[in-house]
A protein has these predicted regions:
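Short beta-strand elements bearing conserved aromatic residues within extracellular beta-rich modules
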Residues: 18-20, 122-124, 160
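Short Gly/aromatic-enriched secondary-structure transition segments
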Residues: 24-25, 127-129, 138, 176-181
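Short proline/glycine-enriched turn/loop motifs at strand-loop junctions of beta-rich domains
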Residues: 11-17, 115-122
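Substrate-binding/active-site clefts of carbohydrate-active enzymes
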Residues: 181-183, 202-218, 222-362
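The feature marks proteins involved in alpha-glucan
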Residues: 1-7, 34-116, 141-222, 230-232, ...
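An acidic- and aromatic-residue-enriched active-site/binding cleft used to recognize and process polar
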Residues: 117-119, 127-129, 165-167, 261-263, ...
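Short, surface-exposed loop motifs enriched in S/T, G, D/E and P with embedded aromatic residues
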Residues: 27-35, 134-141
């Protein structure tokens, strides 16, 4: 609201024309194109906040109708949670950052948040905006560099990345560090939404409470996916579950320690260079398939220990390495130089945000 009325401003460099449909008006109101960069504006003689829909026409004459992402305002979140995240004492940081399918003012969509303190700009890109980082630019909402945007009408299952502009001229595409799902290696993208819920074996849950390593000995088999003698091109999580079940029953192990369960993009054969700490590897199926593998092992009375490495992470350009141009998660120069073949760098543990990230992922 301004003194003269209700000002609507839209930046759509992909649009030929933009109009708005206001609930209190029968006809759409045409926005004036203010400059060639794609800035549109209109002043509506109404002295109150109104709900409106954007009608965006592209160069092919196709019109897209959507709610303005910037008309919703900030999502309510206690400052205490943001402060705990910055202090390294927020142990459920995945509820604060990443993507969340939710509603705002009765409109469904996806809320995105990411931490990038050194970035000049952060945008959400995907097929839904033709991977154009100029369209859904995020708002910096905290002093320590958390960015946020709510994109209405977006649904679960959409592939996306963050386009991050560094100081200078560099612009890179990054996976969401808090994404619960990541697609396959070559075209790795983060995916909106949560994996489907899978009900665990009730009998196993009760049995697990009784097994504490005191009244019954544990025998643990350490195994990595790459070591399983199956056809890697065709194997899936259920194939792995069947192989492990057969092997464990033949050898008498009670637990399996599985290495390399998080998303790893380095192809050196090592399981240390993790790139996705909240998403299981998509090489053998979806995150939901991974849950079914866990359930199948539990159905056969096999306990599971997931190997989780918080000592260092991978240097794939799509991952958290140099995430915001200032390497907020780690160090620009790897500290573990005696093992360069592992393609890893170390975490900056002195930063509270990094500690919250790691503890929350356990």
């Amino acid at each position: 609201l301004v003194k003269e009325g209700y000002l609507i401003q839209v930046f759509r460099p992909d649009a030929v024309s933009v109009s708005v449909s206001v609930s209190e008006r029968k006809r759409a109101i045409q926005l004036e194109k203010v400059d060639d960069a794609g800035f549109f504006a209109a002043l509506i003689p109404i002295k109150k906040n109104v709900k409106y829909v954007l009608n965006i026409e592209d160069k092919n004459g196709h019109i897209t109708r959507l709610r303005d992402p910037y008309s919703f305002g900030r999502f309510d979140k206690s400052e205490v949670i943001f402060n705990k995240f910055a202090a390294g004492t927020e142990y459920n940081a995945y509820n604060l950052l990443g993507n969340k399918v939710c509603e705002k003012d009765g409109i469904s969509g996806v809320l995105f948040r990411t931490w990038a303190p050194n970035a000049l700009r952060v945008s959400v890109v995907g097929e839904f905006n033709s991977w154009d980082g100029r369209i859904y630019q995020m708002e910096r909402i905290t002093d320590n560099g958390i960015y946020e945007i709510f994109i209405p009408q977006l649904e679960a299952g959409q592939e996306y990345m963050y386009e991050i502009k560094f100081k200078g001229t560099n612009t890179v595409l990054k996976l969401d560090p808090y994404a619960r799902q990541i697609t396959q290696y070559a075209d790795a993208h983060s995916v909106t939404g949560e994996p489907q819920a899978v009900q665990d074996n009730v009998k196993w849950v009760k049995q697990r409470k009784q097994i504490k390593g005191v009244n019954k000995p544990l025998s643990i088999l350490e195994i990595a996916y790459d070591n399983i003698p199956v056809n890697k091109a065709k194997v899936n999580y259920m194939d792995i579950a069947r192989y492990i079940t057969e092997y464990v029953k033949d050898t008498g192990y009670t637990y399996v320690l599985i290495k390399g369960s998080d998303s790893i993009f380095e192809k050196t054969g090592y399981c240390y260079g993790a790139s996705g700490y909240y998403a299981p590897s998509s090489q053998y199926g979806t995150a939901t398939d991974f849950k079914h593998m866990i359930k199948e092992l539990h159905n056969n009375g096999i306990g599971i220990i997931i190997d989780f490495n918080v000592a260092y992470f991978g240097i794939d350009i799509r991952s958290i390495v140099n995430y915001d141009g200032g390497d907020c998660y780690g160090y620009l120069k790897p500290r573990i130089i005696e093992k360069p073949q592992m393609n890893i760098t170390t975490f900056a543990y002195e930063k509270g945000e990094v500690r919250s990230f790691l503890i929350s992922a356990i």
